[in-house]
Amino acid sequence: MKNLFTLPLAALFFLFTAFTLKQDTPSQKLASVDVKGLDGKIINTGTFSNGGKPIVVSFWATWCAPCKKELNEIAEVYEEWQKETGVKVIAVSIDDARNSTKVKPYVEQQEWTYEIYLDENQDFKRSMNVNNVPHTFVLDGNLNVTWQTNVYNPNGGVEAIYSEVKKAAATTAAPAPENK
């Protein structure tokens, strides 16, 4: 009899908690700060675009094993993701100036086809409230953050990212309601 009341009560609690958390999550746009490309050119993150399609921004570092594992897993399915959703992945290294020379050789060795940027002074990291890496954001086509995670989960984490990419793609692709 006790279980008869406990289960519905627990379900109600989790539903209420999930609704409350979703409701209280503030909307966040992509910050606009300068970062450096691997070619040394400065670019403002506010100019990131993908033709109205989703963008994944992944903060990582060469010394972060979970970051590299996550980005390598994404690399294995990136072409498929692009075909299905048009997503663009942008990997932002937070290696400081002393270590940033390791980024380009590592990226070339891994043959990542992502856009790679250096956030040597960590302005972008701070403006996006990134406290640890890996920290991955999913943005809709309007550069609004729709989802984020700051952990690497080797058991389904990349699939969770892609699930959110598909949601962002569907939301962005949905036609705007007509005003009559």
Regions found by a protein language model. Give the residues of each.
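N-terminal targeting signals for export/organelle localization
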Residues: 1-36, 147-149, 156, 171-180
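A short beta-strand-turn-helix
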Residues: 34-55
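Short pre-active-site segment immediately N-terminal to redox-active cysteine/selenocysteine motifs
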Residues: 52-55, 60-63, 96, 132
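Hydrophobic beta-strand anchors of alpha/beta hydrolase catalytic cores
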Residues: 56-57, 89, 136
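Short, thiol/selenol-centered motifs that function as redox-active sites or metal-ligating centers
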Residues: 64-68
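Structural microenvironment flanking redox-active thiols in thiol-disulfide oxidoreductases
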Residues: 69-110, 121-127
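Thiol/disulfide oxidoreductase modules built on the thioredoxin-like
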Residues: 106-112, 120-166
